[in-house]
Amino acid sequence: MRSRRRKRRSFGPLLAVVFLLLLIAGAAAGFVIGRRYMPGKEMADKAELFHIKGSQVAILLNNELQEEKGIYEDGQVYLPISWVNEYVNERFYWDETEKLLVYALPEEIVYADESDMGEQGPLLKVKEGKAYLSLGLIMNYSDIRQQSFDTSQIKRVFIDTVWGTVKTAQVRKKSILRVKGGIKSDIITELSEKSTVQVLESMDKWSKVRTEDGYIGYVQNRRLEKEQELSLIHI
């Protein structure tokens, strides 16, 4: 009688295919997870962030971006007198008929037109029927603090009318300032180690801050240290 032998099936190629599929699936899952948790590297469009173009100057009143825009001419920042009247100092009056600026002091009334010059240039500008006052003139007659950044392409000015105290913190080490509170949010700028920021709002993991170089955004709380309250003093 002839003996019959069963042929053994080889599972090697099948196992190799399964292993390869598992490897591909693992790599794909790792890629998806990596993309989900990897910090975003996109840079924010700063002009879009401040809603400005050309020679426009963004105005931030008490750290809030305003719809109104200033202008930059003759090496100076000029702000719309209508906006100044509403939010900073109502004593400035623009006589549209006479094209004359009127300001009432306790003991006298001061007048100025486009020909009047200050230490750095014209005290006012009229553009497309709209009057603008120089930032220097506004500062001379108003109880405010200002910080302007007019040497960069993204021109902006911070006007603060609120006094009292502010919370500050020190950046623990080199960090990233983002548009929103999340690692995927676009990058505004880098924060250098030991730089000081003003803390505007604190959340669980992120804080909204204002930087020394004139940006407002979000930084992770673990990047901040030495928080303190500082009193603002009228000069």
Name every feature range the model reports, one short phrase each:
Residues 178, 210, 220:
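Residue-level detector of conserved, well-ordered beta-strand and adjacent loop positions
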Residues 194, 207-211:
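SH3/SH3-like beta-barrel fold
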Residues 213-223:
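A short macromolecule-binding patch
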Residues 202, 211-212:
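Short glycine/proline-enriched turns and hinge-like loops at secondary-structure junctions
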Residues 107-108, 212-214:
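Glycine-centered tight beta-turn/hairpin loop motif at sheet-sheet or coil-to-beta transitions
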